[in-house]
């Protein structure tokens, strides 16, 4: 037990810095009020430079072994997509009919990314992660947590879209 509280499991210092009264009822309540809790997580992301519209991550395709040094750089974006491409690493394109993946992006070559080397059910998985992935990992420092958040948002977004 680390003293985390409420829906978002904020630690006390995060509560002091980022909790907000999102529904404007005069009380900031992350324990009993999901509106304040969600608003506070959004505030945390905003304060950590979340970039609206920027995808979080895409599956990566590797060509050769040039990816190895990139995979050792951690998950803070530290190189561009152009540099990744030069090392034989590319994001799955959303416009490529040959590859079907809901985890794709088509971003400018200047976009800063990180290469994640993970183990999935079928073996090694590689992902190119953007600054928004890094923001998620400021909330919880596990790259597996960051990827789980990404993967859980897909069915939630689909359900929300179906209900509109």
PLM features: residue spans?
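Structured segments of extracytoplasmic/periplasmic soluble domains
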Residues: 17-21, 43-51, 136-139, 152-159
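Substrate-binding/active-site groove segments that recognize
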Residues: 5-20, 41
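Acidic/polar loop patches that form or flank catalytic/metal-binding clefts of enzymes
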Residues: 50-58
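Generic recognition of stable, solvent-exposed alpha-helical segments in well-folded globular domains
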Residues: 10, 36, 40, 128, ...
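Acidic, glycine-anchored loop motifs typical of Ca2+
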Residues: 21-30
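C-terminal soluble interaction/assembly domains
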Residues: 60-164
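Extracytoplasmic/periplasmic, Sec-exported soluble proteins
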Residues: 2-7, 29-37, 137, 141-144
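Cation-handling catalytic/transport regions enriched in His/Asp/Glu
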Residues: 32-36, 44, 58-59
